[in-house]
Amino acid sequence: IPTQDGKPRVIVLIVGETARAQNFSLYGYNRQTNPLLAQNGEIIAFKDVSSCGTATAVSLPCMFSKLGRKEFDVTDAQYMQNLLDIAKAAGYDVFWKDNDDGCKKVCDRIGKTDAKQGNKQPYCFGNYCHDEILLDGLEKQLQTITRNTVIVLHMMGSHGPTYYKRYPDKFKRFTPACD
């Protein structure tokens, strides 16, 4: 589907597979847990979804597969085309930028980058990088796009029990933070 202005279509998927929709104000939660996202008029928040599992190794391959929750099998999914394969076959450039523990084979056939590589400051400390690192260099990348493109930003997300390490102090709103 061509864009009206002739520019390439750019789709940015932000994947944070351990986040609970019930705790996002975007989905009706009564506390303002994501006010910056709410201010962006271009956000599409998918509301009628559920996870195939509670671990990245299952939930990530499932969300990019054609299989539903009931019929999903990790081994079967490895040998099927997933959403990213189909986008690539349709002529899209497809990139995966990761701030978690990898794509669990979802991005094996496309371009991928480990955002944590190089331990960039001020985003990284020890074994962790805040998800803001996924935005590092993104604006420059967006300016150089000449073809339809899908970019997946895989967040570390809200894995416990060290929740307080998932965000910089400037975003600390709810206490106690168990740090």
Question: How does the language model describe each region?
Answer:
Residues 1-13, 18-178:
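Active-site-proximal alpha/beta segments of enzymes that process anionic O-linked groups
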